[in-house]
């Protein structure tokens, strides 16, 4: 199976052939996947070199001319390093585009903290009007990328990861998918967290919602997952980025119902002995065994 990044390159290359409004902007990273596309469309596959602020500025400039830029590099460079340009060149200028990240929170532990961005979703969430997709499988990544490329002048962030679920689920570019039903609580699994969540809650009487679009937050699906007649609700959010990123959104969705929310994800404390991805996940308490202990302790 190809990776999400490989699927991004092949999908974006196909879209360049069919939509003259699209352009791909790169900052050295990912250029190999676009070699053929750059030869076919030298004016619409642009590599600015290792200049991430210029990467965003170029995308924003293209958007001002009426084009639809697909802007790509590691999340730590795309969002963290170039945040001021994202805020101004897309938000303040009122333009739209698609930011496509790789690396995520801990995809390359050996690369160190410079190549990790556990706070990307939370940071973008301080800005207005961004749709944010977190696919959990290459097929989902392709569907969401195609949706984002065709989304008029909207501002869209697509967060790719090396971690994937075993099978793709239907995605529409909005709304949570109900995967299983229960009565003791609701667990929202974001993107590549789904398989670990399902393994963790096996045998527990809980509902599981699958989120591949996290902004806008799907208030309606969360409320619908609460059993009819319930006077209280317990919700667990399992996100592959900063723990608690969506806690406020869940609280707002359930504002008129007494409830508790547990936000699980990447902690603020930096893990400095990185190891492998699996070791890093375990160190963060996001492996199935740790998730089960934390969920059952919360539900009592």
For each feature predicted by the language model, list its residue ranges.
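Thiamine diphosphate
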Residues: 1-153, 161-300
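Short beta-strand segments
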Residues: 72, 98-103, 134-135, 157-161, ...
